[in-house]
Structure formats: structure tokens, C-alpha cells
């Protein structure tokens, strides 16, 4: 993979991945742009799910899918076919412009010149020149032949820039000969450049809101623009003014398509209508169809008798275009002109459902989602899989049903922008290493009854995602033993995309789990992976434990309290309350204790009888009762859960203890729980 890099300081990084199927044949969100190859009938669609898909429009069956082109990790905003259909250029919210082999579907190179979302592309067919523009107010010109010739040894590319824009650019257009380039922005004006000299020639005022779409006539003399103000304007560049304003939509105009003779305008709007209008006589118009959502993009079908349309929804539909029949001479000497009937749906490429709602369950391992078709699905974040499809059930009731009374710190966030669940791991507001749990709770299928192990969700997941990454020059600690990869418990799907990106910024690296073993991918990971990732994946360091301070004092009902003052202790936050009970018996009451799950007879066979031997064989939690805020605490609860659900205060947690039976005890308060917890 070739990368056009700019020099910049190392920034804070995050790691994200997408829970998805190995092959996603349907768009899972809106479709922003279309390109039809008239040579073979292939339709290219740029999705908000970050995927470009290719369809066979000549197929009579409902199965038109050919392949997916994947390397972006955010909305693909625009695409253009070039080099007679051999290559495709794409622009994305991930701030990159990518060059693709359109026939084989792989990414040839990535251009990282833009500093913000890349919103629009323009193509001059006769010159094989592409322009890109976006929210960074910049316009760059690219020579397509140079881009497609990039290799591993020849990876330097130069670009010309068009300066002067003062606001974010949302639309861009060029004529085929590349003599005129026009941009539209939130500045509400059109700026015109000569791309041959990179000089700005004029700016045109008239729109009152963002200019969302543009078309330049083949001769470069006229421009048609659509705006969020609901109008379509026709501009004469020679006269440097608007010569016509067309009002046919009730809301913003987001897409324009012109007839070959530049006489008819087909427009798609936020009002969900597609309308065809005669440019010279705007009153001569007709409705093509009413879509089910705001219209994002339009494109002709093969014989230009219909128009493909995309919307906020994931379906792509082809509608029959009405034709204007100027009619015959009537008795009064006029013409009986009329539109032929259009609006028939000629074809439909069905899309999939986009996830619209998501809840992270209290166990911080599973998420529950609801999509645009009201289907409720359970995902396992740790194993990166869809766990269960529950159907169109009551979402809120299911969340309530599945939420347990357990508190585990947030260790990931969920992004639904693409319509699929993207899980984000980082070290900023949410620490991905904050979730320590017992293996019994986190991975019950891996429990060894003879051990009590704590696992860290973030560490296990990063080790699984980067299981195949072996850094250059790595040497096993023991050459007689093989290198240990992964986390030793489970693997994640090998098709999972893993993305390294700057926090709140640009993508640095994207790869699939299975590809991390490649030489180039290993080198790229070595250069881009943040230190907090290499610490756990390569160095095998253990994330630090988070500790909780708390007070321990006798309950007022204690018959013979050892002392009345509170003692301040510190312990790992995942320590269960049964350990506090053991501490009370061992260190406060100096009584013998049987660890939970141990054989009482074996552990106490050498202990002296004190008259309470039968009681002393019971686990500590059956001999000591802990309470917090006058609520008896479940010994299986950990300290952080008690603090979150019962204590509910910002001050240090306070426990009261009392015996469930009368025991003989003497001695003083022992060491703090700091020492006790080290062995658990």
C-alpha cells in the first residue's frame, strides 16, 4: 500500500474495530454517490458504511452484487470513474483520497493531503485530471496518470492547490476539457478557477445557504447550482451573473443531473422528490418520483431512459424518466405538449439495516442494538461477534432484563456512524485497561476451579486483534519454546478490520486481523502502534490495578466490638466483598477462616478446637455480615459495584461488619487490606 504522508508530530492514538460479517453485500447506511460505467453496466456506489460496492445493472435477477472495495473507515462522500473505467477515485470523511483498480477492486494508493473531511471530487475526462475538496477549505488538483503509476519505489506525487476559499467546500465540478473548475461552499457563493493556471477568475453571489451540488456545461460557459436554500440557479460565466433561478423544491437541492444537450435538469432534494425541469422554461416540469428519504445522488442508467437514485436509506432505486412530447399542431394553431408518464420503478438494489440505537450493558462485555428495521441484536464486544438476533422485541424491556447489578468501568466506546458497530479503544476519556474482572465472570467457559484469576478485557482484546503481529527482530525468550501469540483464551474473526487513528482526527493505518502477519503490515504497525498497545501486546506488560479506599467499622449491634473507630483500608476495586469478610475474621477478630470453595476439613485439620469448630469450618461470608448504607451486601459483589449501586457518594466507601454467630475473638486490627489483596 502506498501512502502520501505529511510530516507531523506524533499525536494521541486510538484503536477501533468493526463487528461485522466477513462479506457485507448490502449497504448498511445511506449512499452518497454513484458512478455508472457505460462500457459494461457496472454501477459503483459509495456508502456511508465506508464501503464502495459494485453492481451488475445488466443482471435481470435481484442478485446484482459483484464485489466490495474496502479501505476507507468512514463515510465515502464521492467517487469518480476515470481512465475509461479502469480506475476509480474516492473521497472520504476519513480525510483521505484513494486510488483504486476498479476492475479488481483493490486500493492502489492513499493520498493524505487533506486535513479534514474530503467532501467532493471533480473530473476532467479529456485531461485525466481530478480535483478534490473538503471541509479544510482546500482544493487539490491531481494528475490521474501520475496517481495510477505510483509504486513502492516511486511513491512521490505532487499536487497543485487552488487557494482562496474561506469556508468548508461541499461541491465541486469541472468541464470535460478541464478549462473551468467551480466550487460551492457554506460561504453561499460559487468560486471559479482556471485549473490550467490555478488562478481564480471570479466569484458569483446569489444563494443564501450552502451550495450543495454543481454541474458545468461541456463548453464551460454555464454552471447549474443547487443549494440548501431550495433553489436551482443557472449562471452565465461570460456575463458573470445568475441568469435564472428555479423554484421547484420545498427544501434543499442536494443532487443535480443534466441531459446531454444541457436542456433539462433532473434534481433531487431533501424534500424526497426527484423532478425534471426544462431549463429554458422552468414552468415546464414534472415529478419523476417521490423517494422515501432525502435524495443524495442521481445517475443515468445504461440507455438513459431511467435514473438511479440514492437516499439516506440504504436502497438504490432506478426510476423511469418521463419524456417531454411537444405534440402535434392543434385546431387553434398551438402545440398539445405533454410529459409521458414516468416514475415507474425499473430496478431496486436492496440495502441492509443501519444500527440506530445502542446500549452498553452493565457487564461491559455485551452491547444491545436496535436497527432501522426495529431488529434487536446482541453483540459480544470481547469476542467481536454477533451473539444473538432477538427480532423486533421491546428494546427498553430487553435492556432492563439483561442489565445485571454489577458495575464495571467503561473501557470502550461505540460509534454507529457507519451503521455498523465500531468499537473504539483508547487512553483518553475512557481507559481501555480499566476493566478488571474475575475469569469466572468474564470467561466462565475458561474457568479452572483450582485457581482464581483476574483478567483485563482491554488487554485480552488487543492481544486477540493483533494476534498475528510479530515485530521485526523479535526473539523468543526461550528458543526451545515457540513465541506466544494472542491471549491464550480465544480468537476473534480474522476478517475484522482494525483501524489506528489519531484521537478525533485522521486515520493512520487500517488492516484486517489476518493481515497483521504480512511484512509490510508488521512494519507499518511498528511505526504507528502507540506505546500503550505495544506495552501489552508485544512487551506483555500487565495493566495497573485500580484501587479503592474504604472504611471498615464494627456494626453498632456487635456485642463485643474490638474498637469503635473506623479503619481506612485500600484494595483493588475488583476484590469481592467475601475477601473483606475474610479480612475481618483473620485480621480484626483473629479467627480461623476457610476460603470460599475450599475444603473446610482439610484446611482446618490442624487447627485447635475453640468450642466453635463447627462454625469455624464455614466460609467467612457465612460468619461475617457486611453492610453499607444499612443494606446487607452480597459477598459476591466487588468493591466498585458496592460503591456504584449502594454507597452512591463521592466520599470514601464505608462498610460495617458484624458476626452472624457468637465467636471467641481477641487481638487488634491487622494490617491494611493492601497486603491481603496482593495474593488474590
From Swiss-Prot:
Chain intervals with Low complexity compositional bias: 596-609
PROSITE patterns: WD_REPEATS_1, WD_REPEATS_2, WD_REPEATS_REGION
CDD domains the record matches: Ubl_WDR48, WD40
InterPro entries with a match to the protein in the record: G-protein_beta_WD-40_rep (IPR020472), WD40/YVTN_repeat-like_dom_sf (IPR015943), WD40_repeat_CS (IPR019775), WD40_repeat_dom_sf (IPR036322), WD40_rpt (IPR001680), WDR48 (IPR051246), WDR48/Bun107 (IPR021772)
GO MF annotations in UniProt: ubiquitin binding
Keywords: Repeat, Ubl conjugation pathway, WD repeat
Gene3D superfamilies referenced in this protein's UniProt entry, alphabetically: YVTN repeat-like/Quinoprotein amine dehydrogenase (2.130.10.10)
Pfam families: DUF3337, WD40
Superkingdom of the organism of origin: Eukaryota
UniProt family annotation: Belongs to the WD repeat WDR48 family.
Subunit structure: Catalytic component of the Usp12-46 deubiquitylase complex consisting of Usp12-46, Wdr20 and Uaf1; regulatory subunit that, together wtih Wdr20, stabilizes Usp12-46. The Usp12-46 deubiquitylase complex associates with arr/arrow; the interaction leads to deubiquitination and stabilization of arr/arrow.
Function: Regulatory component of the Usp12-46 deubiquitylase complex. activates deubiquitination by increasing the catalytic turnover without increasing the affinity of deubiquitinating enzymes for the substrate. The complex deubiquitylates the wg/wingless-signaling receptor arr/arrow, which stabilizes the receptor and increases its concentration at the cell surface; this enhances the sensitivity of cells to wg/wingless-signal stimulation.
Protein name: WD repeat-containing protein 48 homolog
Species of provenance: Drosophila persimilis
Lineage: Eukaryota, Metazoa, Ecdysozoa, Arthropoda, Hexapoda
Amino acid at each position: 500500500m502506498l501512502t502520501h504522508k505529511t510530516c507531523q508530530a506524533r499525536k494521541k492514538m486510538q484503536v477501533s474495530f468493526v463487528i461485522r460479517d466477513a462479506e457485507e453485500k448490502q449497504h448498511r447506511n445511506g449512499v452518497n454517490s454513484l458512478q455508472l460505467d457505460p462500457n459494461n453496466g457496472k454501477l459503483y456506489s459509495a456508502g456511508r458504511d465506508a464501503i464502495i460496492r459494485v453492481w451488475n445493472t445488466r443482471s435481470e435477477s435481484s442478485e446484482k452484487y459483484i464485489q466490495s472495495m474496502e479501505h476507507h473507515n468512514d463515510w465515502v462522500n464521492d467517487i469518480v470513474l476515470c481512465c475509461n473505467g479502469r480506475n476509480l477515485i474516492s473521497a472520504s470523511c476519513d480525510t483521505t483520497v484513494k486510488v483504486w483498480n476498479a476492475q479488481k477492486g483493490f486500493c492502489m494508493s492513499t493520498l493524505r493531503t487533506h486535513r479534514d473531511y474530503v467532501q467532493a471530487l471533480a473530473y476532467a475526462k479529456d485531461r485525466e485530471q481530478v480535483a478534490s475538496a473538503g471541509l479544510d477549505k482546500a482544493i487539490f488538483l491531481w494528475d490521474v496518470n501520475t496517481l495510477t503509476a505510483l509504486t513502492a519505489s516511486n511513491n512521490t506525487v505532487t499536487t497543485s492547490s487552488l487557494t482562496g476559499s474561506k469556508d468548508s467546500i461541499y461541491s465541486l465540478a469541472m468541464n470535460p476539457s478541464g478549462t473551468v473548475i467551480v466550487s460551492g461552499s457554506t460561504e453561499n457563493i460559487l468560486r471559479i478557477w482556471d485549473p490550467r493556471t490555478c488562478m481564480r477568475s471570479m466569484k458569483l453571489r446569489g444563494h443564501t445557504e450552502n451550495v450543495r451540488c454543481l454541474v458545468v456545461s461541456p463548453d464551460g460557459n454555464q454552471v447549474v447550482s443547487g443549494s440548501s436554500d431550495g433553489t436551482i440557479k443557472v449562471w452565465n460565466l461570460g456575463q458573470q451573473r445568475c441568469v435564472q433561478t428555479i423554484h421547484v423544491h420545498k427544501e434543499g437541492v442536494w443532487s443535480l443531473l443534466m441531459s446531454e444537450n444541457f436542456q433539462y435538469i433532473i434534481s433531487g432534494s431533501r424534500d424526497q422528490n426527484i423532478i425534471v425541469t426544462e431549463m429554458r422554461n422552468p414552468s415546464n416540469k414534472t415529478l419523476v418520483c417521490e423517494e422515501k428519504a432525502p435524495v443524495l445522488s442521481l445517475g443515468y442508467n445504461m440507455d438513459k431512459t431511467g435514473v438511479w437514485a440514492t437516499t439516506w436509506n440504504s436502497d438504490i432505486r432506478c426510476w423511469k424518466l418521463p419524456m417531454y412530447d411537444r405534440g402535434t399542431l392543434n385546431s387553434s394553431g398551438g402545440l398539445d405538449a405533454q410529459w409521458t408518464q414516468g416514475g415507474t420503478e425499473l430496478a431496486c438494489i436492496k440495502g441492509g439495516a443501519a444500527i440506530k440505537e445502542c446500549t452498553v450493558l452493565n457487564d461491559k462485555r455485551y452491547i444491545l442494538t436496535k436497527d432501522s428495521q426495529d431488529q434487536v441484536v446482541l453483540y459480544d464486544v470481547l469476542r467481536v461477534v454477533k451473539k444473538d438476533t432477538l427480532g423486533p422485541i421491546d428494546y427498553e424491556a430487553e435492556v432492563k432484563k439483561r442489565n445485571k447489578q454489577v458495575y464495571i468501568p467503561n473501557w470502550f466506546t461505540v460509534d454507529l456512524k457507519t451503521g455498523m458497530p465500531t468499537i473504539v479503544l483508547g487512553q483518553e476519556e475512557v481507559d481501555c485497561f480499566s476493566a478488571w474482572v474475575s475469569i469466572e465472570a468474564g470467561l466462565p467457559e475458561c474457568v479452572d476451579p483450582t485457581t482464581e484469576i483476574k483478567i483485563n478485557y482491554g488487554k485480552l482484546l488487543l492481544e486477540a486483534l493483533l494476534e498475528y503481529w510479530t515485530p521485526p527482530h523479535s526473539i523468543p525468550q526461550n528458543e526451545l519454546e515457540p513465541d506466544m501469540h494472542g491471549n491464550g483464551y480465544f480468537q476473534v474473526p480474522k476478517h475484522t478490520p482494525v483501524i489506528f487513528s489519531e484521537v478525533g482526527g485522521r486515520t493512520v493505518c487500517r488492516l484486517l486481523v489476518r493481515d497483521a502477519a504480512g511484512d509490510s503490515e508488521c512494519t507499518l504497525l511498528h511505526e504507528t502502534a502507540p506505546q500503550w498497545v505495544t506495552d501489552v501486546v508485544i512487551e506483555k506488560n500487565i495493566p495497573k490495578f485500580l484501587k479503592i479506599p474504604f472504611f471498615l467499622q464494627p456494626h453498632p449491634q456487635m456485642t463485643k466490638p474490638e474498637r469503635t473507630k473506623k479503619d481506612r483500608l485500600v484494595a483493588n476495586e475488583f476484590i469481592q466483598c467475601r475477601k473483606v469478610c475474610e479480612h475481618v475474621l483473620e485480621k480484626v477478630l483473629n479467627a480461623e477462616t476457610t476460603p470460599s470453595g475450599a475444603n473446610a476439613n482439610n484446611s482446618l485439620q490442624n487447627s485447635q478446637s475453640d468450642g466453635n469448630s463447627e462454625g469455624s469450618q464455614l466460609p467467612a461470608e457465612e460468619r461475617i455480615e457486611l453492610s453499607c448504607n444499612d443494606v446487607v451486601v452480597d459477598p459476591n459483589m466487588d468493591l466498585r459495584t458496592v460503591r456504584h449501586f449502594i454507597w452512591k457518594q463521592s466520599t470514601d466507601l464505608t462498610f460495617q461488619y458484624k458476626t452472624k454467630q457468637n465467636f471467641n475473638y481477641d487481638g487488634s486490627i491487622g494490617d491494611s487490606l493492601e497486603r491481603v489483596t496482593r495474593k488474590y
